[in-house]
Amino acid sequence: MANTDAFFSRPLAETDPDIFGAIEKELGRQRHEIELIASENIVSRAVLEAQGSIMTNKYAEGYPGKRYYGGCQFVDIAEELAIERAKKLFGVNFANVQPNSGSQMNQAVFLALLQPGDTFMGLDLNSGGHLTHGSPVNMSGKWFNVVSYGVRQDDNLLDMDAVAESARKHKPKLIIAGGTAYSRIWDWKRFREIADEVGAYLMVDMAHIAGLVAGNQHPSPFPHCHVATTTTHKSLRGPRGGMILTNDEDLAKKFNSAVFPGLQGGPLMHVIAAKAVAFGEALQPEFQDYAAQVVKNAKALSETLVKGGLDIVSGGTDNHLMLVDLRKKNATGKRAEAALGRAYVTCNKNGIPFDPEKPFVTSGVRLGTPAGTTRGFKEAEFIEIGNLIVEVLDGLKVANSDEGNSAVEASVRDKVIGLTGRFPMYPYL
């Protein structure tokens, strides 16, 4: 009995101090550093509680009301709430909330709509696409005939005429619109016109901008697309996971079958419960304000960096992210990411269109505002952050080495700690 009592009551700090210590260190990092990775965000306490709940104990293969296990009546409530809230949030008729990740949601669409060897079109990785949009190192690029489209070299904007021409030539079965590092508004209507002309399905991967769509800061892909996929973290501010949305009942059945039993077994019910919580939060009026502030902050950061002597790919941003071309500062993405990290500013190196550097080096970094906006940062803070970034990069240019400029980085680090200290997170932890 004593062993059972300990199993159910002994806290993590006692059971596994190594993991507890790692979590505590990560909490400290998140509290004290500025998070600018565009695909990351900060979830609410309510989302954390749902994801860390006893729903993790339950197996629930199948869908609500049609499970292959007994005892699912309460996890069914959670999944039904997630589905209904997702449908309301994006104004659609069908939602599958079971995909465990963004890659799996996209794979499910491929499984439902394509056969190995079929042709599809997607944004080239070097132009801001995603691995699952046809990269040769990804399953999507190995199993299918991929025709990539990209941006123009002169302005780094999507070349829609070239997309149309390529579609007419290659007759894809599926066209994917959406990306991970494109900072401008997507013309869903034009993509649908191209898809209709060649008899293709239009799939929109809005993983990065779903929160902006929900917050009325970016046009919705509906009614133009046949299917939209999105992760549930990033700008949507939920737990890590994926989701598939459509208005077509026949396609919805195919997507459901593709997710289960096609790709996954038992869904992660604790994550689905957390998705439901996040969708509920996104349905509140204050989420509209949040999404608007994300975009305002991105514009403020972008403009500050330009004033500091940096180039922004495509000349600016209309959403939550920007690609920063570092070549004017004589820096690489690899070197800049490391230097900014030492100064407690977290970002990721990222290739820019037509990048002369290798993928592990790059000529750019990608920056995003969702996490900082969640903390409460507004334009004034992002102007300050932009100036700190320029300060680090100018110091790096003077040092001209991987070691960077320790004096400048230490000074900026102190300023970052002062800034983040004014915007506490998870005070109960």
Swiss-Prot record:
Its EC number is 2.1.2.1. InterPro entries: PyrdxlP-dep_Trfase, PyrdxlP-dep_Trfase_major, PyrdxlP-dep_Trfase_small, Ser_HO-MeTrfase, Ser_HO-MeTrfase-like, Ser_HO-MeTrfase_PLP_BS, SHMT-like_dom. One of its GO terms (biological process) is tetrahydrofolate interconversion. One of its GO terms (molecular function) is glycine hydroxymethyltransferase activity. The keyword Cell cycle does not apply. Pathway: One-carbon metabolism; tetrahydrofolate interconversion; Amino-acid biosynthesis; glycine biosynthesis; glycine from L-serine: step 1/1. The keyword Electron transport does not apply. The modification N6-(pyridoxal phosphate)lysine is found at residue 234. It catalyses: (6R)-5,10-methylene-5,6,7,8-tetrahydrofolate + glycine + H2O = (6S)-5,6,7,8-tetrahydrofolate + L-serine. (6S)-5,6,7,8-tetrahydrofolate binds at residues 125, 129-131. It comes from the Bacteria. It is found in: Cytoplasm. Its cofactor is pyridoxal 5'-phosphate. Homodimer. Belongs to the SHMT family. Catalyzes the reversible interconversion of serine and glycine with tetrahydrofolate (THF) serving as the one-carbon carrier. This reaction serves as the major source of one-carbon groups required for the biosynthesis of purines, thymidylate, methionine, and other important biomolecules. Also exhibits THF-independent aldolase activity toward beta-hydroxyamino acids, producing glycine and aldehydes, via a retro-aldol mechanism. This is Serine hydroxymethyltransferase. It comes from Allorhizobium ampelinum (strain ATCC BAA-846 / DSM 112012 / S4).
